[in-house]
Amino acid sequence: MALNVVILAAGKGTRMRSDLPKVLHPIAHKSMVQHVIDTAHKVGSDAIQLVYGYGADKLKASLGEQQLNWVLQAEQLGTGHAVAQASPHIADNDTVLILYGDVPLIQQSTLEALLAARPENGVAILTVNLANPMGYGRIVRTPCEGQEQGKVIGIIEQKDATAEQLLINEINTGIMAVPGKQLKAWLSRLSNNNAQGEYYLTDIIAMAHADGVAIDTAQPQSAIEVEGANNRVQLAQLERAYQAREAEKLMLAGANLRDPSRIDIRGDVTVGMDVMIDINVIFEGKVTLGNNVTIGAGAILIDCEIADNAEIKPYSIIEGAKLGVAASAGPFARLRPGAELKQDAHIGNFVEVKKAVIGVGSKAGHLAYLGDAIIGDGVNIGAGTITCNYDGANKHLTVIEDNVFVGSDTQLVAPVTIGKGATLGAGSTITRDVGENELVITRVKQKHLTGWQRPVKIKK
């Protein structure tokens, strides 16, 4: 029996006041619908039907490389009508899981519980109890022996509910698991004879009850999982809820967060034990932090690996880089893609490293650019050092071997190699290879001019 997931993503989202389709608005730098697609994959979907309408070009540009079956809903005539567009792609023996592209926080564990709750050849509905159920369809039950809550017999929408039904606080989330054969039959019988003039997907529950099909329910751990976003205020609320959830995961995994409400997690972060994370840190992409790592305030980490006991000092940007054991960067350091700091290496304030390896124990304390370079162990890079790697057309490599001392304000014009133990005098411009243990100074000879008069301002 295959799991066929139908994701409804056809709405425009007028209240977002945006040209972007509603489901493409982001939570943690990922579109809402992408969150839903990712969760569908996690529960083992065999096929995903994406029902789309407004903004097709933008949707396909964002999602088009994925294994999705694109199903057009040319007119938005209700949720039942939307699912019906996917009917030709549903096999009789499929289990159909219906999800929503603007409900991004639904959890894998919740969907697994819903699928487990579905009776054989029956229907499972995800419901939630709300103190204020205004606007939602209510779950209608009838007393049944052996079922404390009673048997589900239907779902009534807010505008069609009686005064008594409006008192019900168990609401329909719209998420359900349905057998394929029966779903297609029920969809063909839907009517739009209701206050909205739409084809309600919820009407299939009354049909299931009338046909004697077993109906069961499951509930999420938190109601926020089934909240949607219809405007930017709600989008921001979901963002905060997502961030709180991800921060909690980090703390449970062994990280200390100085303030869990002031962290942004926009990717997959893996942490070791006793990690310390200060305020206003941003994580993007895939980030791995080893044991006893310290991240300073305001740091941004993107697609990087940080080994045990390493430290990222405040306001540093680490992107596509690796830090070895006990290495450190910052404050105000920038490591660009391809940068690698070996064990105990240090990059200080206002140092930029790009596509360069900094060897064991090597240091560049301040104000340097190290690009397209291989730097050995025990090297000292003075302030103001620049590897001149670009000739206007191509990038060239600088090699600095072990135990080299580079004086301040030195320019290394690549391609160039500095041999082991060499010393480069401050203010030098190095254009040729330097041998082992050589001292090289290329400064202009200092001149002393006596009797010189400093210019003075001309009075107007």
Curated annotation (Swiss-Prot):
The active site is at residue 366. Its cofactor is Mg(2+). GO terms for molecular function: glucosamine-1-phosphate N-acetyltransferase activity; magnesium ion binding; UDP-N-acetylglucosamine diphosphorylase activity. Acetyl-CoA binds at residues 383, 389-390, 408, 426, 443. It is found in: Cytoplasm. One of its GO terms (biological process) is cell morphogenesis. UDP-N-acetyl-alpha-D-glucosamine binds at residues 8-11, 22, 73, 78-79, 100-102, 137, 157, 172, 230, 336, 354, 369, 380. One of its GO terms (cellular component) is cytoplasm. Residues 254-460 are annotated as: N-acetyltransferase. It catalyses: alpha-D-glucosamine 1-phosphate + acetyl-CoA = N-acetyl-alpha-D-glucosamine 1-phosphate + CoA + H(+); N-acetyl-alpha-D-glucosamine 1-phosphate + UTP + H(+) = UDP-N-acetyl-alpha-D-glucosamine + diphosphate. Residues 1-232 are annotated as: Pyrophosphorylase. Keywords: Acyltransferase, Cell shape, Cell wall biogenesis/degradation, Cytoplasm, Magnesium, Metal-binding, Multifunctional enzyme, Nucleotidyltransferase, Peptidoglycan synthesis, Repeat, Transferase. InterPro entries: Bifunctional_GlmU, GlmU-like, GlmU_C_LbH, Hexapep, Hexapep_transf_CS, MobA-like_NTP_Trfase, Nucleotide-diphossugar_trans, Trimer_LpxA-like_sf. Mg(2+) binds at residues 102, 230. Residues 233-253 are annotated as: Linker. Binds 1 Mg(2+) ion per subunit. Pathway: Nucleotide-sugar biosynthesis; UDP-N-acetyl-alpha-D-glucosamine biosynthesis; N-acetyl-alpha-D-glucosamine 1-phosphate from alpha-D-glucosamine 6-phosphate (route II): step 2/2; Nucleotide-sugar biosynthesis; UDP-N-acetyl-alpha-D-glucosamine biosynthesis; UDP-N-acetyl-alpha-D-glucosamine from N-acetyl-alpha-D-glucosamine 1-phosphate: step 1/1; Bacterial outer membrane biogenesis; LPS lipid A biosynthesis. NCBIfam families: glmU, PRK09451.1. Homotrimer. This is Bifunctional protein GlmU. It comes from Shewanella baltica (strain OS195). The lineage of its organism: Bacteria, Pseudomonadati, Pseudomonadota, Gammaproteobacteria, Alteromonadales. The gene is glmU.
